[in-house]
Amino acid sequence: MQDQRAEYDEAKDRLYVQLLDESVDNTVALDDRRSVDYAADGRIVGVQFAKPFAGGINLSGIPLARVVGALILQSGHKFRMVE
């Protein structure tokens, strides 16, 4: 999909991986650094990672982890992947 992308906000130290260009209806926090946004129909809109440089990126338990990981790699940022 052309709407898919990973964007890092340096000021907020947050990485957002957008999977769909849809409105967010519900956000589910996986832990204190990761959350998943859902559309009203249950599709995944995006995934947010807080402090990705300090804590690394953990894809464990992330829906569509392979797609999310590929978009992060394509972003050009050098985030450390952790388990």
Where are these regions (language model features)?
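Small, basic N-terminal interaction modules of short regulatory proteins
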Residues: 1-83
